[in-house]
A protein has these predicted regions:
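Alpha/beta-hydrolase fold catalytic core
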Residues: 1-40, 63-64, 285, 291-300
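Catalytic histidine-centered segment of alpha/beta-hydrolase-like enzymes
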Residues: 275-284
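Conserved alpha/beta-hydrolase catalytic His-Asp/Glu region
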Residues: 161-216
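Catalytic histidine neighborhood in serine/cysteine hydrolases
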Residues: 263-274
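Active-site loop/oxyanion-hole signature of alpha/beta-hydrolase fold enzymes
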Residues: 18-19, 26, 55-58, 68-110
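Conserved serine/cysteine hydrolase catalytic core
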Residues: 194-259
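Conserved hydrolase catalytic core segment
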Residues: 105-144
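Conserved HGGG/HGGXW glycine-rich cap/lid loop of the alpha/beta-hydrolase fold
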Residues: 27-76
Length: 300
């Protein structure tokens, strides 16, 4: 097993109190890695954190250097002074700074939900180039009711008396991840909890919910315009792309997933049975699909 190591990148940030902040990232670097100059960069979903990718990283580490980011306000990364900056443009700039720090000869991207949006923005804009892209249950069109569902819980800041209480809360909240063993739920949940003076809290800044404040009941013109921008970014992506979709996902519709196979990157679609939003990339069959795609010589 390759033990992940925690690293920090200091970012100069004039908008942050103190003028700088720390961006945390984890690395799985196998001593006998076949291609350490090829980095697989994995970026998590809205309320998640980098260690979500541990199982996938273990499978890839003998072949690639694997890095996963704690996006600003999550995990071990600093919280932002201004909650309005919890948005994709900030995350894109941060991730680009990390890529420049890592200096990979080749880059592959794995993005779950929000992490996929960041990847589309980076690659579609030409700010970064990748050998291969994996989009996990995300696309240019996101279902509005699902966004409202997510917005309803993301700003909460519960405190749990025990770790077990926190883990039970997360297992219920993320039931759409599909069936997992108790050990798998524990591995997915423990990094999500932080000790406090009176119990345990979730790892992220509750202010990441800023983008959901005042969200209208139905899609407005601003949301429609943002959707068109995302499609334009997706259409500009040229690298081989694998699209995973949970068969029961309420965020990525079957119609959007099919459209993504016909335009832009012309993604290869893999549907994960008995899973909603989003596949965890923990189950062996999910890991195998992603690993085989990223290691395939046909993803030049």
């Amino acid at each position: 097993m390759t033990k992940p190591t925690l690293h920090h990148l200091t970012l100069t940030d004039s908008l942050q109190t103190g003028g700088q902040r720390q961006l945390a990232w984890w690395q799985w670097q196998h001593p006998a890695c076949a291609q350490p100059e090829h980095v697989v960069l994995a970026v998590h979903g809205l309320t998640r954190q980098a260690l979500d990718f541990d199982v996938l990283a273990q499978a890839l580490a003998p072949h690639r250097r694997v890095v996963a980011l704690d996006v600003a306000g999550r995990g071990h990364s600093d919280w932002l002074s201004d909650p309005a900056r919890y948005a994709v443009p900030t995350y894109v700039a941060d991730t680009l700074a990390l890529i420049q720090h890592l200096q990979p000869r080749e880059l592959s991207w794995v993005g779950t939900s929000m992490g996929g949006l960041i990847g589309m923005a980076l690659l579609g804009s030409g700010a970064a180039q990748a050998r291969a892209l994996v989009l996990n249950d995300v696309g240019p069109t996101l279902e509005w009711l699902a966004l409202r569902r997510i917005g309803a819980y993301v700003g909460q800041a519960p405190v749990f008396a025990t770790q077990d209480e926190g883990m039970n809360h997360l297992a219920l909240l993320h039931a759409s991840f599909g069936a997992h063993s108790p050990e798998q739920w524990r591995a997915l949940s423990l990094p999500m909890l932080r000790p406090t003076t009176n119990g345990w809290r979730l790892h992220y800044d509750p202010a990441i919910a800023q983008a959901f404040v005042g969200m209208p009941q139905t899609m407005d013109q601003a949301a429609h315009d943002a959707q068109q921008v995302l499609w334009a970014l997706y259409d500009a992506i040229a690298c081989p792309t694998l699209l995973l979709r949970g068969a029961q996902s309420d965020l990525l519709s079957p119609a959007t997933a099919q459209a993504m196979t016909q335009r832009g990157a012309r993604a290869t679609l893999h549907t994960v049975a008995d899973v909603g939003h989003a596949p965890t990339l923990v189950q062996p069959a999910q890991v195998e699909v992603v690993r085989d795609f990223l290691l395939s010589p046909v993803a030049p």
